[in-house]
UniProtKB/Swiss-Prot annotation:
Gene encoding the protein: FAM220A
Matching InterPro entries: FAM220A, SIPAR
GO molecular function: STAT family protein binding
Biological process, per Gene Ontology: negative regulation of transcription by RNA polymerase II
Name this protein carries in UniProt: Protein FAM220A
Length: 259
């Protein structure tokens, strides 16, 4: 049977067998099996230093991070550099690279973390978008339903039958009034995901999550007065206010996508 592990998996298996599970032996054995070659020009100095003993590389890494925490933190465990925009972001804020928890936030969040928010956030907002739970966004935006066209015509076929009964009544009364319908579910997924990165405590807390979702409407609408009222009303909740302010770029991006 053909080995599906590939060259890397085969190499790691051989190294693990030879090292007997010892981390120092595994490191030395893997170093010997790696082909010699020049490292990239922007690689940190500790990357191309020979391994004399099991602790030399960790000591070099510790010393290098003290000298240049941003440079040392920009390399993955596999030895490859991270994306350029991440590098630039960390260089602008070197203090963030010094803490592992902050550095982890530079990379995409695992799907299971966002699963807690998807049901109460994205699915609920997407359903209200189709069922008209807020003001219509047909004026001045392309990609939405044109005037006079029933929203049910835009629904996928498997959603038309169970949700058809909601359209027999007045759409705004089908669900409680709350969030607007100016954003598509795909945009909402990006918004909530970005918020989860920057302010996870906002969406992971049951108390602040409901307040945050209820106040997304003035953020993505033209109701300037309501938006100012929303900021004043959340002055006692700093995390919620900061989370809403962090979403302003998404409002501009959504406007450009539909213009």
């Amino acid at each position: 049977m053909r080995d599906r592990r590939g060259p890397l998996g085969t190499c790691l298996a051989q190294v693990q067998q030879a090292g007997g599970g010892d981390s120092d032996k595994l490191s030395c054995s893997l170093k010997k099996r790696m082909p010699e070659g020049p490292w990239p020009a922007d690689a940190p100095s500790w990357m191309n230093k020979p391994v004399v003993d099991g602790n030399s590389q960790s000591e070099a890494l510790s010393l290098e991070m003290r000298k240049d925490p941003s440079g040392a933190g920009l390399w993955l465990h596999s030895g490859g550099p991270v994306l350029p925009y991440v590098r630039e972001s960390v260089r602008r804020n070197p203090a963030s690279a010094a803490t592992p928890s902050t550095a982890v936030g530079l990379f995409p969040a695992p799907t299971e973390c966002f699963a807690r928010v998807s049901c109460s956030g994205v699915e609920a907002l997407g359903r209200r978008d189709w069922l008209g739970g807020g003001p219509r966004a047909t004026d001045g935006h392309r990609g939405q339903c044109p005037k006079g066209e029933p929203r049910v015509s835009r629904l996928p076929r498997h959603q038309k039958v169970p949700e058809m009964g909601s359209f027999q009544d007045d759409p705004p009364s089908a669900f409680p009034k709350g969030l607007g319908s100016e954003l598509e579910p795909a945009c909402l997924h990006s918004i909530l995901s970005a918020t989860l990165h920057v302010y996870p405590e906002v969406l992971l807390s049951e108390e602040t999550k409901r307040i945050f979702l209820d106040r997304l409407k003035p953020m993505f609408s033209k109701q300037t007065i309501e938006f100012k009222k929303m900021l004043k009303s959340t002055s006692d909740g700093l995390q919620i206010t900061l989370g809403l302010l962090a979403l302003q770029p998404f409002e501009l991006a959504n406007t450009l996508c539909h213009s």
